[in-house]
Swiss-Prot record:
PANTHER family xref list: UPF0502 PROTEIN YCEH
Protein name per the record: UPF0502 protein VS_II0353
UniProt similarity note: Belongs to the UPF0502 family.
HAMAP family: UPF0502
Superkingdom of this protein's organism: Bacteria
Cited SUPFAM superfamilies: Winged helix' DNA-binding domain
TM spans (from-to): none
Taxonomic lineage of the native organism: Bacteria, Pseudomonadati, Pseudomonadota, Gammaproteobacteria, Vibrionales
Source organism: Vibrio atlanticus (strain LGP32) (Vibrio splendidus (strain Mel32))
Residues in the signal sequence: none
Length: 218
């Protein structure tokens, strides 16, 4: 299975996995329901505004790669779609409930810390604590058939490192590190500027007080 997904394909697969677990009575999804799921504002990063045409084009591509199937009946007026991405009879990717939850959440929101993943996978799987999330992540990193997740450099000022899925291809670790340094540098520059502004304001107040004192003595 060719598992390199475009951003839209990743969103579609993530939504289908999510809805299979959280709303089984309404799964498989119609094109309208799938588009709504892709564009919803909660538990999505970034928030998208895809048209049904955008989603259908991506779904057709995923059907061609056997990652999605059309489950509508012969006489059905509405097509319904389900994923074949993981945990299927003949599929390459077989996940535990916890692994599936983490992968799903990453497909929907990108890079996240173990703490964020534990909070955001509440409807998909149970984790006793953050350490259990970290343990599952390390299994996905060290997977014998090939890593599905990578640990990113810890951002300055952050307690936890983020993890990113590799289902959309290799991650440029240096780019993430550079972006982190740039963000910290920008923040530091902003703080320095604010400090200088505060110092200037204080000096102006002192000058005004001295002028008033001099004038009172004349």
């Amino acid at each position: 299975m060719n598992t390199v997904l475009s951003p839209i394909e990743a969103r579609i697969i993530g939504c289908l996995i999510e809805k299979e677990v959280t709303t089984p009575d309404h799964y498989p999804l119609t094109l309208n329901s799938l588009t709504t799921a892709c564009n919803q504002k909660s538990n999505r990063e970034p928030v998208l505004s895809l048209s049904e045409s955008d989603v259908l084009d991506a779904v057709d591509g995923l059907i061609g790669r056997r990652m999605v199937s059309d489950e509508s009946s012969f006489n059905s007026r509405v097509n319904k779609y389900q994923h074949r991405f993981c945990n299927t009879e003949f599929g390459d990717l077989q996940f535990t409930e916890q692994e599936r939850a983490i992968i799903c959440c990453m497909l929907l929101r990108g890079a996240q810390t173990p703490g964020e993943l534990r909070t955001r996978t509440g409807r998909l799987a149970n984790f006793s604590d953050v350490k259990e999330v970290e343990s599952i992540l390390e299994k996905l990193v060290a997977r014998e058939a090939g890593a599905l997740v990578v640990k990113l450099p810890r951002e300055a000022g952050k307690r936890e490192s983020r993890y990113q899925h590799l289902l959309s291809g290799e991650v440029d670790i240096e780019a993430f590190a550079t972006a982190s340094v740039s963000a910290v540098s920008s923040s530091a520059s902003s703080e320095k500027f604010e400090e200088l502004e505060s110092e200037v304001a204080s000096l102006r107040e002192e000058v005004a007080e001295l002028k008033a004192l001099v004038e009172s003595l004349l």
